A protein has these predicted regions:
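Conserved, carboxylate-rich catalytic/transport cores that coordinate ions
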Residues: 3-266
Length: 266
């Protein structure tokens, strides 16, 4: 008789395990974009559902022209109506382009840009009422870009804490949670001093608690002095890196503005 030996074991972090993304509906449309980058490991979060809304919004802000967005939406819609035997994979890509076109159209209405011209210069009651309702000037668009950058960075840190908890255990996420407390409390104190005054008792409680978590649990397996040293180093990286990361979101505003200028020239 022949004998067969087999062994069943959980994969180790070093194993190269095949990855199958499992998203539904709206989020599945963004899987091709996710595949352009590194796929998550089997024991990591699939970030597709979390980056999809941001990608859609940022695409619209970068293109920032309601005329281009309307053209994308209508062109793909007409193609889907007249084309025959469209592959399933192509259908999802076409739907994604329609969504990105709709996002571009909506974001273009924030500035009134349509093929390089300003819709809100047209003295028609509909456009003027739309201008009063949703129009943003350059300074407001600049501020919106910075706010969106701050929101996405903090949201990314929350996902990082969740990922650390899944992979290594909660204690490895404590330092990240501490930095989240520091940043969120500072943002609230800056934006809404009436709710939480900057340097007030409530703000200081969150600040001290967050820094203690960040300094004492930076690397839970090491001693307290190493943790404090690593925490100080992280403070430097946080101060310099965070400023650069948030300012990089100004490119959303700059790309939309430059696109409108180029369209008006040509």
């Amino acid at each position: 008789t022949e004998e067969v030996y087999y062994e069943i074991s959980d994969p180790s972090p070093e194993d190269d395990v095949p990855i199958l993304l499992n998203n539904k509906g709206f989020f599945r449309l963004f899987e091709p974009i996710m595949r352009l980058y590194m796929l998550p490991k089997y024991n990591e979060l699939d970030l597709t559902p979390f980056f999809a809304p941001f990608f859609m919004l940022f695409f619209g802000l970068c293109l920032g022209d309601s005329g281009y967005g309307l053209f994308m939406l209508l062109a793909v819609t007409v193609y889907r109506l007249v084309a025959k035997n469209i592959a399933a994979s192509m259908k999802s890509i076409l739907t994604l382009v329609q969504l990105l076109g709709a996002s571009t159209m909506v974001c273009g209405l924030l500035t009134g840009t349509c093929f390089g011209f300003n819709l809100y210069d047209i003295q028609v009651p509909f456009f003027q009422s739309l201008k009063e309702a949703i129009s943003l000037d350059n300074q407001q668009m600049f501020n919106l870009s910075l706010i969106l950058g701050g929101v996405q960075i903090i949201f990314g840190m929350i996902l990082k804490a969740v990922n650390q908890t899944i992979q290594f255990g909660f204690k490895y996420a404590v330092a990240t949670i501490g930095w989240i407390l520091v940043l969120v409390s500072a943002a609230i104190a800056f934006a809404a001093p009436g709710v939480m005054p900057m340097g007030g008792t409530v703000h200081l409680v969150f600040l001290v608690a967050g820094l203690l978590m960040a300094y004492l649990y930076n690397s839970p397996d090491k001693n307290i002095f190493v943790n404090i040293g690593l925490g100080l180093w992280d403070s430097y990286n946080m101060a310099t890196g965070l400023l650069g990361d948030i300012l990089s979101y100004v490119r959303l505003f700059a790309l939309g503005l430059s696109g409108g200028i180029l369209a008006s020239v040509f």
